Amino acid sequence: MYINSGYLNNPRTDFKDNSTPLVVGSCGTYRLKTRPKLPTYRQKGRRDYQILYVANGKTHFWFDGREEIVSAGHMVLYKPEEIQKYVYYLEDNPEVFWIHFTGSDVKNILAYHGISLDEHVFYCGVLPDYKVLFRKIIQECSCAAMGTRTILHRCSTIFCCWWTASSVNRKKPPAMSKSKLNARRLTSTRTITQRSA
């Protein structure tokens, strides 16, 4: 199994931090090579939020006791203290990136980017940019000297890309040019950064 991950604090404990609007606690990726399956079951969930991006293959998730197979190009969102049950199978060739985050303004930040807390699975597309962003966040979580502003910028970029792709998937194309989308991303990053200062 291939694992690459970075942690802001202790990797064995989740945490809740309301001292700033958004804090990334950890980020990583899993890819099965020989292990037949990798199950995760958190009956009480975690204290933070989690996004999982299925970059390749498919994964099996359970929401409200029902199995849902999630294919490449989708992100899954878990809220704090929500039951988490999912399994990666070798035969499905899964490559999954994940990020755990917390903060005093997470709900508003997600809402600003059009990400509903009432849903779990969102289409966002299979883009190499996502892998690049996640890998950079992993690296930055591993190097505390990099600071949090860069990580916040990358999270904001992920949220903006997610919002754009999910809007298109809902048959509601965003009424924004590329320059307006970039301006929205910059505004979002500035807002998060200012609130963190």
Regions found by a protein language model. Give the residues of each.
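Short, charged, low-hydrophobicity "junction" segments
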Residues: 1-9, 106-109, 132-135
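A short, N-terminal "cap"/entry segment at the start of jelly-roll beta-barrel domains
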Residues: 1-23, 140, 166-168
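N-terminal regulatory/effector-sensing and dimerization cores
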Residues: 10-12, 19, 26-116
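Hydrophobic packing within well-folded, soluble alpha/beta domains
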Residues: 51, 70-73, 159, 184, ...
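Short, locally clustered residues in the helix-turn-helix/winged-helix DNA-binding domain
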Residues: 55, 164, 189, 193
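Amphipathic alpha-helical segments enriched in hydrophobic/aromatic residues interleaved with Lys/Arg
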Residues: 109-175, 186
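DNA-binding recognition helix and immediately preceding turn/loop
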Residues: 174-197
